């Protein structure tokens, strides 16, 4: 008998996460490492697990994630969206519950590019009147 897997793709800033949900005991593996070893901050892990806690499926599924690009916050946001989308693929009735907590919407904010003649995206050289 084949193991049923549900997939979800999440993106945030410059990070991309491919999430695979399989029936299991609640293990979370990120790039072949435990979540606690991969992320140094516990708050980031709690934020990432939010879709599972909202739907009360934290101990039902094992989660395997392949994530690349960006920093810890962007990767955690991408994983969070990927988990939410995988849960919706598994059970479309969960979408309403996840949408109330704003977990199925992609955060489209990205870093604004630096413009020529400026020091950053908006920081201009100091203006001298005389």
UniProtKB/Swiss-Prot annotation:
It comes from the Bacteria. The gene is rpsI. Keywords: Ribonucleoprotein, Ribosomal protein. GO terms for molecular function: RNA binding; structural constituent of ribosome. It comes from Mycoplasmoides gallisepticum (strain R(low / passage 15 / clone 2)) (Mycoplasma gallisepticum). One of its GO terms (biological process) is translation. This is Small ribosomal subunit protein uS9. Belongs to the universal ribosomal protein uS9 family. Pfam families: Ribosomal_S9. GO terms for cellular component: cytosolic small ribosomal subunit. SUPFAM superfamilies: Ribosomal protein S5 domain 2-like (SSF54211).
């Amino acid at each position: 008998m084949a193991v049923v897997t549900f997939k979800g793709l999440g993106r945030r800033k410059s990070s991309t996460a491919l999430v695979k949900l399989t029936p299991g005991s609640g293990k979370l593996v990120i790039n072949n490492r435990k979540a606690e070893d991969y992320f140094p901050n516990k708050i980031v892990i709690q934020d990432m697990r939010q879709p599972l806690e909202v739907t009360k499926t934290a101990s039902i599924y094992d989660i395997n994630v392949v994530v690349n690009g960006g920093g810890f916050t962007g990767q955690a946001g991408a994983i969070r969206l990927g988990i939410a989308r995988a849960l919706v693929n598994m059970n479309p009735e969960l979408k309403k519950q996840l949408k109330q907590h704003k977990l199925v919407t992609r955060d489209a904010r990205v870093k604004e590019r630096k413009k020529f003649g400026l020091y950053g995206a908006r920081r201009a050289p100091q203006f001298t009147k005389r």
